[in-house]
């Protein structure tokens, strides 16, 4: 495919893309940049970044920034919905995933451990929304929309991996979400990526907490 993902040696904002690519059997190159090199302006990466941040996606001479934009581009593998309504609903689902992710980021980057109980209460509310969504779609294949996995599923799966690492029992009251994580994690190509050395050696975030 000739895809290159430029990012720090973390899972972070690039991991949902890696889950998607790995599961779809698409090869890519991880171009890892150390944070101190990024800050020092190596290869003019920061200077040339449209909004001063990465991940950066490149295919030939085409360069793209912003994680959700890149994720939607990669959804061209038939992962955005089968009609206009499904496409719109998947966008809505992905926005909901981002709401969940931002609450997680707020806690992991800015809150202290004393606020963990409050965060877990808020997390349970957010998880409840997705449990209800899966309940409504339970007659299909245990994905968020319709009967086929979408980019929103990869983004949700990555976010769930993050919160499970923080609180391993956080899905105990959500049987469909627990099953969702287990089912998707057993998809052969995705499982292969999840067991890869690249995935294992990368911490979730760069702040030393995960």
Swiss-Prot record:
Please report the stretch or stretches of sequence annotated as the GST N-terminal domain.
1-82
Q: Report the InterPro entries cross-referenced here.
A: Glutathione-S-Trfase_C-like (IPR010987), Glutathione-S-Trfase_C_sf (IPR036282), Glutathione_S-Trfase_N (IPR004045), GST_C (IPR004046), GST_pi (IPR003082), GST_superfamily (IPR050213), Thioredoxin-like_sf (IPR036249)
Q: Where is the GST C-terminal domain?
A: 83-204
Q: Which reaction does it catalyse?
A: RX + glutathione = an S-substituted glutathione + a halide anion + H(+)
| One GO CC annotation | cytosol
Q: Does the entry feature the keyword Nucleotide-binding, yes or no?
A: no
Going by the record, the broad EC class of this enzyme is transferase
Isomerase as a keyword? no
What Pfam families does this protein map onto? GST_C_3, GST_N
Q: How does it assemble?
A: Homodimer.
Protein name, per record = Glutathione S-transferase P 2
């Amino acid at each position: 495919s000739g895809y290159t993902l430029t990012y720090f040696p973390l899972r972070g904002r690039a991991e949902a893309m890696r889950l998607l690519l790995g599961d779809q059997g698409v090869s890519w190159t991880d171009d890892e940049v150390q944070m101190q090199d990024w800050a020092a302006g190596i290869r003019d990466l920061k200077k040339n970044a449209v909004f001063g941040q990465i991940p950066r996606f490149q295919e030939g001479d085409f360069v793209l920034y912003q994680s959700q934009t890149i994720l939607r581009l990669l959804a061209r593998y038939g992962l955005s919905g089968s009609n206009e309504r499904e496409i719109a609903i998947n966008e809505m689902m992905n926005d909901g995933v981002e709401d969940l992710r931002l609450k997680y980021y707020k806690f992991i980057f800015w809150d202290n451990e004393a606020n963990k109980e409050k965060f877990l209460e808020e997390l349970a509310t957010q998880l409840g929304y997705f449990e209800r969504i899966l309940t409504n779609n339970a007659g299909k294949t245990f994905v968020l929309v319709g009967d086929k996995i979408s980019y929103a599923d990869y983004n949700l799966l990555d976010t769930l991996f993050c919160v499970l690492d923080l609180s391993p029992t956080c899905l105990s009251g959500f049987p469909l979400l627990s099953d969702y994580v287990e089912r998707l994690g057993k998809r052969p190509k995705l499982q292969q990526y999840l067991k890869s050395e690249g995935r294992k050696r990368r911490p979730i975030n760069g702040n030393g907490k995960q």
